[in-house]
Amino acid sequence: MAAIGVHLGATCACAAVYKDGRADVVANDAGDRVTPAVVAFTENEEVVGLAAKQSRIRNVSNTVVKVKQILGRSSGDPQAEKYIKESKCLVVEKNGKLQYEIDNKLISPEDVAKLIFSKMKETAQSALGSDVNDVVITVPFDFGENQKNALGEAAAAAGFNVMRLIHEPSAALLAYGIGQDSPTGKSNVLVYKLGGTSLSITVIEVNSGIYRVLATDTDDGIGGVYFTEALAQHLASEFQRSCKHDIRGNPRAMMKLMNSADVAKHSLSTLGSANCFVDSLYDGLDFDCNVSRARFELICSSLFSKCVEAIKKLLEQVGFTAEDINKVVLCGGSARIPKLQQLIKDIFPNVELLSSIPPDEVIPIGAAIEAGILLGKENPSLEEEALFIECSAKDILLKGVDEMGADKFTVLFPSGTPLPARRQHTLHAPGSTSSVCLELYESLGKSPMNEENKFAQIVLQDLDKKDGLHDILTVLTMKRDGSLHVTCTDQDTGKCEAITVEVAS
């Protein structure tokens, strides 16, 4: 029986199969190993992938892109608000949930993701010639519980049995067998993922086959689309210079340039120059322009600077120098860019830069290997050779009340806490109250707390009123998969309540 791994990115999706002791990415019906995560809705059907991307110019208001950015989010979430503002599809809130309004029909982000997962399932089944149900799905390190659950629900709706959600950096290490090739000794690995809409960097300690995440950081202001946009702006300037028309305010013309710039960007990863030709770009005028790799690197110089500064910042955060890193793993389609690879080599001149697996295939391959391990059919010894110690991606906070009855937040699991982990906290509540509600929140960085951050609550009722304070002992245990068990006990009476917050895996 084969197992598969699926990576649903913001801009692309990819499926890999683990069979006969080997993991490999499978091509879709167009012969491409990576599928655009784009869904177009027409009068008669839903179109997924390259065809949807290519037809977007003619069907922009009915074509959904970057659905991953809104999965599991609600209005008021800064990421969701940014997405809604930029989306060409109308996004509305109905019954407390964000949905696309397309041709007077409401379509949830989960339904869009389901169509992409269905495409991945069809792709894998076509390659194998048999049904595939069991899957491991990758998630970004900073995904919250709501986002994980939404992703898992979408995959299940597509007919998948989701065996596990695995963090993307963990999948990257599995793909290269890091920790298995050197079962003894200690090393530090930096996983560098430059995807379509974000840059994620993670430092992982590998010690005798045990993997522990030391630090991670994600920047949503750097990604492949930003390189494409920079090149498209340059092309618009060239068109204005040669044809005397400024098309920057024309969405249709700029979308055509974005498509051309995207193709050119990919070509420049292997070629010294690329041709950008757009038929009838504006007012019947064709556009034809050559861009050299050197020119592209100059146009995107500020983006390249951000890409390397992010590495230095994370190393400083964890107290490392470049010499403390033993290996660098490249992930994400934009990590193919030669200039970026050279800049990373300049930071780590004596470090092995792992890029033998195409960067946009590393993560799904690792997920497929994990799927094979979980099925236990192909190479069960792998499970004994590598143990991941995951860590909490976000701060987990407990909201209670202080002696004066005011809200008070206490960080119990700071982001980066190795899992599994256990914490306990004694909350002091006014003795005049007969019930205490403790709410759990998750946060990244120093963002202000609001209702959008709450993911669970526990209520301790029927407390005996008393002079002084109630002492409520709260014990939280977070497992490796991110699930959280919480118990609250009144120290005076022993009255206890407990909840478990499961994850989609």
From Swiss-Prot:
Chain segments annotated as transmembrane: none
Single GO MF annotation: heat shock protein binding
Subcellular location: Cytoplasm, Cytosol
Main location: cytoplasm
One matching Pfam family: HSP70
A GO cellular component annotation in the UniProt record: cytoplasm
Keyword Chaperone part of the UniProt annotation: yes
Keyword Nucleotide-binding among record annotations: yes
GO BP annotation list: chaperone cofactor-dependent protein refolding; protein refolding
Entry keyword set: ATP-binding, Chaperone, Cytoplasm, Nucleotide-binding
Superkingdom: Eukaryota
SUPFAM superfamilies: Actin-like ATPase domain, Heat shock protein 70kD (HSP70), peptide-binding domain
PANTHER family, alphabetized: HEAT SHOCK PROTEIN 70KDA
Biological role stated in the UniProt entry: Component of the ribosome-associated complex (RAC), a complex involved in folding or maintaining nascent polypeptides in a folding-competent state.
Family under the similarity heading: Belongs to the heat shock protein 70 family.
Oligomer status and interactors: Component of ribosome-associated complex (RAC).
Protein name per UniProt: Heat shock 70 kDa protein 14
